[in-house]
Amino acid sequence: MKKVFSTRLLFIIAVALLVSQKMRAQAFDGADDHRVYVGYSHIGKLSGVELGYEEGFNDYLSWGIQANVLFTGDKPDEEGKFLDAYDASFHCNFHWSEVFRLPSRFDVYTGVLAGLKTIGIGCGARYHFSENFGIYAAAHYSPISTFTLSGSRVYYKGEPALSVGLTIGW
């Protein structure tokens, strides 16, 4: 019984190693790239969650959308002030992997973003463990407010935003 288990385990490990040698993990595939990412976000002194989608346009450019929610500790009120902690944005990134001939598992990018609350710039990096799964870290700075009502609390403008999370591609 123990010998059969050991043989099966060795077979599974051998197959996994062979398959992993055939697969090439790439952090950015260009026009064929589609990614969903989810992560922890820290903006100013507040924490939150971000969820986004990114699609490659060519070997150097990608576009995407992103939604952020900050945990302010405020309760929903009648005036709708809790909506001040939400943001949605569009971003366009330039990927430096081809330019600097980085390993295919690693991607460094810079870009611009325009959202419901702010306009800004950002940069980030991704590392992929496999063809579909990886991690990312990003930083953004948004010096310009867009649609803010008078009396609204401004959480996003002028605050550094840092985020880390998981990315899933197909």
Which residues does each PLM region occupy?
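Bacterial Sec-dependent N-terminal signal peptides
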Residues: M1-G30
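Residues on the lipid-exposed face of transmembrane beta-strands in outer-membrane beta-barrel proteins
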Residues: Y40, L51-E55, A88-E98, V112, ...
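Solvent-exposed loop/turn segments connecting transmembrane beta-strands
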Residues: V38-E50, K75-D84, G111-G122, G151-E159
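Repeated loop/turn-to-beta-strand initiation elements of outer-membrane beta-barrel proteins
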Residues: D59-I65, V99-P103, F129-I135
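Transmembrane beta-strands of outer-membrane beta-barrel proteins
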Residues: H34-V38, W63-I65, F106-V112, I135-A137, ...
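Predominantly the C-terminal beta-signal and adjacent terminal strand-loop region
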Residues: L70-E78, Y127-W170
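Flexible, solvent-exposed loop segments that connect beta-strands
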Residues: A27-H34, I65-Y86, F106, S145-Y156
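Short glycine/proline- and aromatic-enriched beta-strand/turn motifs that initiate or cap beta-hairpins
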Residues: Q21-W63, F90, F94, T167-W170
